[in-house]
Amino acid sequence: MDFLEVTKANYVGGHKIHLWFNNDVDKVVNFENLLQGEAFAPLRDENYFKNFHIAYNTIEWDNGADFAPEYLINQ
């Protein structure tokens, strides 16, 4: 099996992102309760949170914060 990848991501609102994966699964993930710890502190600001990009097969923010696609698909 190939590695799981996020292929597309759209900001929905609040701390929610609609994600598409390379295994034909798509879902809206609510990150509100996932933003624990210092690395994710900037993402608690919705204006910062919505400025993500796809890098290394997942979503990433400018501060280097990211989530493994395997984790995201199970949320």
Model-predicted segments: where are they?
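Motif-centric detector for short Cys/His coordination patterns
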Residues: 1-75
